[in-house]
Amino acid sequence: DTEHRVSLAGLSQPRVEPEVVFGFARAPRAGMTLPQLADCLEWVAHGFEIVHTHFEGWRFAAPDCLADFALHGRLFVGPRVPVARFADLALDTANLTVTLHRDGQPVETGHASIVLDGPLNALRLWVDGMAEHTPGWPIRAADLVTTGTITDAWPMSAGQRWHTTLGDPRLHGLTLATVG
């Protein structure tokens, strides 16, 4: 589904982040190359993560944020596209552009390469970090992972309509209509 109504109730200072989302077909392991990691994936999709924090003005240090279990509020994942439709998943997702619109007006165009040199590379770094720092928490088939925002995180309020247009026809834009 590409259109969603989302309640902002219970969220503090919510912001919207357009991201790339990957779904695993099988468990990856640390130290994989990008092509090896791509072979562990079943699908790729565009998603919206809504993040929030009670730290006033979004001013905090990363350790404070992590200790507070802050940021993630909601996740909306668009249509899942089989990775087999991408000749070079690392390059194709790194070259992705996303234009974020609020109430019909473009607010920012982002390039996925800003996400640690591309979403698949960001995923590789995350897989390696998970193996090193949380070896008892394995990544399994059917898990999904978001890879980081492609634009700034934009403040949201009730009554807005957020929409994305993507520079790759294989991936679908999403629309969020916000309510209180």
What would you call each of these model-derived segments?
Residues 102-103, 147, 167:
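Short strand-turn-strand beta-turns centered on an Asx-Gly dipeptide
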